[in-house]
Amino acid sequence: MPSSTYPRRRFDEVFLVEISSRILVTQEKHQQEEEEKKVRMAGKANVSVLMSEDASFHQKVAVEKRLKIGEVILRFAMIALALVAAVRVGTDTQTRTIFTIEKKAKYSDMKALVFLVVMNGIVASYSLLQGLRCVLSIYTQSPLTSKPLAWLIFALDQTMAYFSLAAAAAAAESAYLAERGQTEFQWMKVCIFYEKFCHQIGEGLVSTFLVSLSMATVSGMSAYHLFRLYGSKGKSIQ
C-alpha cells in the first residue's frame, strides 16, 4: 500500500507544478498583452495630439500666407492710388479770363494741395520699398522674426496712415471752401469759375482717401505681425 501511494503522490505533485507553471505563463502573457495594449493606446493618443498640432500649425501657416499676399496687394495698390492722386493734383491747372483779367489756377496756390502732393509721393515711395520687402519675404519664405524691425515697420505704417489722412482732410477742407465759399469772410465760390480745376482736385482727393484707408488696413496687419511675436513667445511661422 505505501509503495502504490508514493507514485500517485509524485504524479499529483508533478501535475500541480505543471498546472501552476501554465497558470503563471498565462498570467504573464495576459499581463504582456495588457501592457502592449496600453502602449498602443498611448501611441494612438500621441498620434492624435501630433495630428491636431500639425493641423493647427498648417492653419496658422495658411493664415500667415494669406495675410502676406493681402499686404503685398494693398501696398502696390497704394502705390498706384498715391501716384494717381499726386499726378492729378500736381498737374491741375486752369486759366480763365475774369473781367478782362486772365487768372490761372494751379495746385501750388493752396498749401494744403501742396502738402497732399508731397505726402502722396512719400507714401508711394514708402509703399514701394515695403512692397518689395514683402515680395522678398514670400519668395525666400523668411518670416518677420525681428522685434525691433517689426516695431519700426508698425511705427512707420502708423505714421504714414496718420499723415495721409491729415493731408486728405486738409485738402478736403480747402476744396470745400473753394466749392461753397465762406460768406462770413466774404470768400466767394471759386469752383464756379474753375470747374475743371475743382473736378480734378476732387479726383485726387478720392484717391488720397483710398490711400488712407488702405494704409490703415496695412497698419492693422503690421500690428498683427508685431504682437504675434509676443503672443507666440517669439516663435515664428515658417
Curated annotation (Swiss-Prot):
Cytoplasmic side, ranges: 1-66, 133-148, 222-238
For this record, the Gene Ontology CC terms, alphabetical, are: plasma membrane
- Tell me how this protein sits in the membrane: Multi-pass membrane protein
Q: Which domain of life is it from?
A: Eukaryota
- Has UniProt tagged this entry with the keyword Transit peptide? no
> What transmembrane ranges does the database entry give?
67-87, 112-132, 149-169, 201-221
Tell me which UniProt keywords the record has, alphabetically.
Answer: Cell membrane, Membrane, Transmembrane, Transmembrane helix
Annotated family: Belongs to the Casparian strip membrane proteins (CASP) family.
Specify the protein name. CASP-like protein 2BC2
